[in-house]
């Protein structure tokens, strides 16, 4: 059986991995998953991202903790296969008043809401991370 929403599965694996205090998690890899993971790593929400090559490439994410608590307090899927959410540059949301990050898929690639605002781009809101 095929997976209906691989991005939601990725976010759930991150959420569950941190709830279980896992050091690292792995999942099937895709270009979009790697791009999202790289944005989360650049923002400091996860430690590192590694793609393990093979017949079926695996994405390995090393989770990050601060004083024994997960750095990611909440991670929430916004746009989904059944209901895509697109926003223009002036409509991009601020998560937790600017403390969190919205991951946005734009014509120039996957980036944070802040980077999209600076570049003057809108796009599909993939998820909120705080």
Curated annotation (Swiss-Prot):
<dbReference type="GO" id="GO:0005840">
    <property type="term" value="C:ribosome"/>
</dbReference>
<dbReference type="GO" id="GO:0006412">
    <property type="term" value="P:translation"/>
</dbReference>
<dbReference type="InterPro" id="IPR035987">
    <property type="entry name" value="Ribosomal_uS8_sf"/>
</dbReference>
<dbReference type="GO" id="GO:1990904">
    <property type="term" value="C:ribonucleoprotein complex"/>
</dbReference>
<dbReference type="InterPro" id="IPR047863">
    <property type="entry name" value="Ribosomal_uS8_CS"/>
</dbReference>
<keyword id="KW-0689">Ribosomal protein</keyword>
<comment type="function">
    <text>One of the primary rRNA binding proteins, it binds directly to 16S rRNA central domain where it helps coordinate assembly of the platform of the 30S subunit.</text>
</comment>
<dbReference type="InterPro" id="IPR000630">
    <property type="entry name" value="Ribosomal_uS8"/>
</dbReference>
<keyword id="KW-0699">rRNA-binding</keyword>
<comment type="similarity">
    <text>Belongs to the universal ribosomal protein uS8 family.</text>
</comment>
<keyword id="KW-0687">Ribonucleoprotein</keyword>
<keyword id="KW-0694">RNA-binding</keyword>
<protein>
    <recommendedName>
        <fullName>Small ribosomal subunit protein uS8</fullName>
    </recommendedName>
</protein>
<dbReference type="GO" id="GO:0019843">
    <property type="term" value="F:rRNA binding"/>
</dbReference>
<dbReference type="Pfam" id="PF00410">
    <property type="entry name" value="Ribosomal_S8"/>
</dbReference>
<dbReference type="GO" id="GO:0003735">
    <property type="term" value="F:structural constituent of ribosome"/>
</dbReference>
<comment type="subunit">
    <text>Part of the 30S ribosomal subunit. Contacts proteins S5 and S12.</text>
</comment>
């Amino acid at each position: 059986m095929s997976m209906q929403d691989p991005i939601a599965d990725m976010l759930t694996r991150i959420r569950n991995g941190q709830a279980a205090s896992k050091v690292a998690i792995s999942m099937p890899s895709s270009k979009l998953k790697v791009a999202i993971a790289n944005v989360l790593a650049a923002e400091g929400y996860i430690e590192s991202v590694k793609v393990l090559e093979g017949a079926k490439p695996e994405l390995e994410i090393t989770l990050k903790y601060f004083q024994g608590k997960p750095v990611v307090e909440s991670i929430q899927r916004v746009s989904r296969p059944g209901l895509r959410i697109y926003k223009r540059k002036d409509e991009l949301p601020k998560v937790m008043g600017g403390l969190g990050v919205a991951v946005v898929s734009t014509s120039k690639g996957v980036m944070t809401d802040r980077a999209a605002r600076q570049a003057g781009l809108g796009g599909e809101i993939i998820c909120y991370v705080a």
